[in-house]
Amino acid sequence: MARDSSTIFYKELIKRTLKARENYVLEIASNDGTFLQPFVKNGYKVIGIDPAKNIARIARKNGVSTRAEFWNSKTALSLLKEQGPARIIFARNVLAHAADIRDFVKGMALSLHKDGVLAIEVHYAGAILKGLQYDSIYHEHLCYFTLKPIEHLLNQFGLYVFDIMASSISGGAIIVYAKKQKIEEK
């Protein structure tokens, strides 16, 4: 299931990215690297960030370059200095865990190439409420999202939503795609 989802996610990201092979692909909270594997198999340079040292070791053993660190603007600046900006950044179901959500997003904005694409997957609060999914509310989730608040948060750091996709993960999630340039409506 995760492997199928990772392939679909890969294809959706590539469709939305120009010059995707330039620079590198960054996943925040990359776990064992499952969602970076399709990029690796297709010749992309990838970097995963995950705070769990044991999981980062597994990812590296599976061919996914992974740093065992928490994501924040300090990590972003260090990575930017070493590797330059990322062409693609994605963070799946991790934003709700961030203690300092503004610093987390600031780090993504700092690390994203000027022509890059950011994809953030979050459990959608609308799905939780509509489906009465009270069992989806966890103590480690510090927030839940609808589109407007996440869009406002991204805008504060010069990131602009250009597409949204529904995901069936966790009983209903949204994937928000953003860029540094505001796309004018026609």
Each model region followed by its residue ranges:
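Extended interfacial segments that mediate partner engagement and assembly in macromolecular machines
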Residues: M1-N54, I58, Q133, Y138
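Conserved SAM-binding strand-loop segment of SAM-dependent methyltransferases
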Residues: G63-S78
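A conserved beta-strand element that flanks and buttresses the S-adenosyl-L-methionine
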Residues: R87-F90
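A short glycine-rich, Lys/Arg-flanked "PGG" loop and its adjoining helix->strand segment in the class I
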Residues: R102-V117
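Short, glycine-/aromatic-enriched active-site segment of Class I SAM-dependent methyltransferases
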Residues: L118-C143, L147-P149
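Conserved S-adenosyl-L-methionine
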Residues: L159-S170
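Flexible, glycine-/basic-rich loop-and-beta segments that form/coincide
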Residues: S170-K186
